[in-house]
């Protein structure tokens, strides 16, 4: 039993970059827009709290929201995607929009790795909580790895593989593995930049690891997730 390929869990806040891309491409937030966040989101029948409640993160944009992992900011994006068409909240509308973008990042199928793997489950309920990686989202570590790789390389979503080549007993190559592209995401450069800037800030600004990370000659980015 491989935990990396079989054990599933909610991605939590690691999902928030998908919500950011969904919000930008669905036209509910611009790259440079800000949201006045509060600690308590009460625009739906099932209110939700930010992790910082009873405090709040104030007025922030996408990069800062990713850095601070502000739940309220992403609740608001989930809400806007659910109300865009009619002005009335439609949970399924918001969920379907988030499902669309999660699928683009590879969560619509197993990762391609040559091992038994659990089938990913993209959330099918609760647009507000789906937007922060909860709802019924359920993925494996390998599926999350493919998603993060897609973020890192500006939109090429590859199938994962453990096999480079296969040789026979005499050392002859009988199979040469070629990379397989699952999907190509053609988002504007400014969108990639604002999301990845937030991920960079996660590990480089006011964190317990920033002092260490800032000493190495490699640009590191990341995202918290609980």
Predicted regions and their residues:
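Beta-lactam-recognizing serine transpeptidase/beta-lactamase-like catalytic domain environment
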Residues: 1-13, 18-226
């Amino acid at each position: 039993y491989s935990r990396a390929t079989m054990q599933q869990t909610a991605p939590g806040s690691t999902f928030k970059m998908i919500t950011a891309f969904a919000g930008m491409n669905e036209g509910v937030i611009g790259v440079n827009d800000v949201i006045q966040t509060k600690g308590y989101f009460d625009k739906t029948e099932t209110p939700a709290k930010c992790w910082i409640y009873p405090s709040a993160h104030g007025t922030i944009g996408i990069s800062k929201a990713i850095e601070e992992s502000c739940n309220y900011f992403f609740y608001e994006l989930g809400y806007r995607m659910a109300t865009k068409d009619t002005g009335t909240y439609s949970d399924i509308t918001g969920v379907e929009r988030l499902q669309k973008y999660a699928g683009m990042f590879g969560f619509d199928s197993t990762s391609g790795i040559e091992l038994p793997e659990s089938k990913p489950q993209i959330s099918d309920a609760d647009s507000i909580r789906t937007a922060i990686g909860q709802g019924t989202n359920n993925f494996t570590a390998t599926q999350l790895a493919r998603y993060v790789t897609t973020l890192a390389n500006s939109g090429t979503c590859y199938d994962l593989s453990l096999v480079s080549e296969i040789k026979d007993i005499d050392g002859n190559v009988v199979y040469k593995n070629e990379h397989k592209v699952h999907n190509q995401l053609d988002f504007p450069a400014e969108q990639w930049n604002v999301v990845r800037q937030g991920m960079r800030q996660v590990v480089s600004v006011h964190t317990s690891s920033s002092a260490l990370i800032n000493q190495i000659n490699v640009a590191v980015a990341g995202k918290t997730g609980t």
